[in-house]
């Protein structure tokens, strides 16, 4: 398997930042009340990861190891500030909905962790791909959790998509469950913890089934007895 495929597999599934490393739980649980909010924060985090990894990798030869962490934080803060201004300019409704969690990307362990563990030691192209894979893995987990909570809580999917994609995206709103009253548990923080636990359990079950399938497909080569070996010769 090539290095690029390994990075994609690690970021999207095997070493998923949300479902394996359990990093960034604060925004994961707080913002995932709707699919739109989850998708918006996930894409913003992905953009920050790609830009940060690219910058750290490009500058890695000129950054003294003694002060590398403050420099990484400055790079991350600069990228996050740029992304925050872009969201404020082009998706103001989403900017208001996400609130403080956009600037809090600076303190997200995923970003500083990938900058230190991978980008500082590898070429620019692979570092950018690593940031993309890790960001998309977190985005997928955020989106699935947000979609589940929105469906169970409000009976809808992609409510408020126009905040992220523009006025045309109002057609994406789907009424799945017709609820007389919203299911508040799904929309509150306890529902987020329960939903995350279900996602973790689901990933574990899938991983175990994949391991069992690989074990069943192994070809057992029979050992030749001495007499059989002589006949073969």
Swiss-Prot record:
<dbReference type="GO" id="GO:0022900">
    <property type="term" value="P:electron transport chain"/>
</dbReference>
<keyword id="KW-1003">Cell membrane</keyword>
<dbReference type="Pfam" id="PF02508">
    <property type="entry name" value="Rnf-Nqr"/>
</dbReference>
<protein>
    <recommendedName>
        <fullName>Ion-translocating oxidoreductase complex subunit E</fullName>
        <ecNumber>7.-.-.-</ecNumber>
    </recommendedName>
</protein>
<keyword id="KW-1133">Transmembrane helix</keyword>
<keyword id="KW-0997">Cell inner membrane</keyword>
<dbReference type="GO" id="GO:0005886">
    <property type="term" value="C:plasma membrane"/>
</dbReference>
<comment type="similarity">
    <text>Belongs to the NqrDE/RnfAE family.</text>
</comment>
<keyword id="KW-0249">Electron transport</keyword>
<keyword id="KW-0812">Transmembrane</keyword>
<dbReference type="InterPro" id="IPR003667">
    <property type="entry name" value="NqrDE/RnfAE"/>
</dbReference>
<comment type="subunit">
    <text>The complex is composed of six subunits: RnfA, RnfB, RnfC, RnfD, RnfE and RnfG.</text>
</comment>
<feature type="transmembrane region" description="Helical">
    <location>
        <begin position="18"/>
        <end position="38"/>
    </location>
</feature>
<feature type="transmembrane region" description="Helical">
    <location>
        <begin position="128"/>
        <end position="148"/>
    </location>
</feature>
<feature type="transmembrane region" description="Helical">
    <location>
        <begin position="92"/>
        <end position="112"/>
    </location>
</feature>
<dbReference type="InterPro" id="IPR010968">
    <property type="entry name" value="RnfE"/>
</dbReference>
<feature type="transmembrane region" description="Helical">
    <location>
        <begin position="182"/>
        <end position="202"/>
    </location>
</feature>
<feature type="transmembrane region" description="Helical">
    <location>
        <begin position="69"/>
        <end position="89"/>
    </location>
</feature>
<keyword id="KW-1278">Translocase</keyword>
<comment type="function">
    <text>Part of a membrane-bound complex that couples electron transfer with translocation of ions across the membrane.</text>
</comment>
<feature type="transmembrane region" description="Helical">
    <location>
        <begin position="39"/>
        <end position="59"/>
    </location>
</feature>
<keyword id="KW-0813">Transport</keyword>
<keyword id="KW-0472">Membrane</keyword>
